[in-house]
From Swiss-Prot:
Organism field: Streptococcus pyogenes serotype M49 (strain NZ131)
Protein's membrane topology: Multi-pass membrane protein
Alphabetized SUPFAM superfamilies for the sequence: F1F0 ATP synthase subunit A
Protein name (record): ATP synthase subunit a
Organism classification: Bacteria, Bacillati, Bacillota, Bacilli, Lactobacillales
InterPro entries for this protein: ATP_syn_F0_a_bact/chloroplast, ATP_synth_F0_asu, ATP_synth_F0_asu_AS, F0_ATP_A_sf
Listed transmembrane segments: 18-38, 76-96, 114-134, 166-186, 193-213
NCBIfam families: ATP_synt_6_or_A, PRK05815.1-4
Keywords: ATP synthesis, Cell membrane, CF(0), Hydrogen ion transport, Ion transport, Membrane, Transmembrane, Transmembrane helix, Transport
Free-text function comment from the UniProt entry: Key component of the proton channel; it plays a direct role in the translocation of protons across the membrane.
């Protein structure tokens, strides 16, 4: 299977992946459109789209309640909800269509199937939880935790690095593998006409399974974010 080319834009020393930028914008637009649509004409007794939105909010709030102190959970509920929606939509975006130019340039993919994107997202989470730790507990107390007990300081620092790395690689591995298998199934239909029905059925089953896995990965990513955040800001961690 021939590897698709990626359209790039080079500005000075920085090279931009145009496909990745485009699908990130689409991801944000989809999330905004869904929340805007679901939050219109809200009623005291929720129904339909409002029920779906409130269920999602309650579901993500439940994640925060497990790992954050009660007095802090509401402060981070919107952040966790945004992370969950963003990762869930980004994971599934590349499963349902494939866009390529006649020159072989790939114009559509899941943002989270790109390792650089996942590393950047993981770096944002890592920096955010440390900044919140300093803001909530103070710089001295935050650094003290990393050096307690002091003989374990190197291991504590290594743990922070592995948390950052595993958060990105876990997400990338699952989503990238899903897109690769989907591509292989689609290629199956190109060999013989009589393979089309089989490829179609297998692709439908695999796509449904991939959607499930993508949502699970969004849940895991959000849960780990709440876990790391709780370790830095909870008073019980003093």
């Amino acid at each position: 299977m021939e590897e698709a080319k990626i359209p790039m834009l080079k500005l000075g020393p920085i090279t931009f992946n145009l496909t990745l930028l485009a699908v990130c914008i689409v991801t944000i637009a989809v999330i905004f459109a869904f929340v805007f649509w679901a939050s219109r004409q809200m009623k005291l007794k929720p129904e339909g789209k409002q029920t779906a939105l409130e269920y999602l909010i309650s579901f993500v709030d439940g994640i925060g309640e497990e790992h954050l102190d009660h007095n802090l959970q509401k402060s981070y509920s919107l952040l966790l909800f945004t992370i969950f929606l963003f990762v869930a939509v980004a994971n599934n975006l590349g499963l349902f269509t494939k866009l390529e130019t006649v020159n072989g340039y790939n114009l559509w993919t899941s943002p989270t199937a790109n390792l650089a994107f996942d590393l950047a997202l993981s770096l944002f989470i890592t920096l955010m939880v440390h900044i919140e730790g300093v803001r909530r507990r103070g710089l001295v107390a935050h650094l003290k935790r990393l050096a307690t007990p002091w003989p374990m300081t190197p291991m504590n620092l290594l743990e922070e690095f592995t948390n950052f790395l595993s958060l990105a690689i876990r997400l990338f591995g699952n989503i990238f593998a899903g897109e690769v298998v989907t591509g292989l199934i689609v290629q199956l239909a190109n060999y013989r006409v009589y393979w089309w029905p089989i490829a179609f059925l297998v692709n439908m089953a695999w796509t449904a399974f991939s959607v499930f896995i993508s949502c699970i990965q969004a849940f895991v990513f959000t849960k780990l974010t709440a876990t790391y955040l709780g370790k830095k800001v909870n008073e019980s961690e003093e």
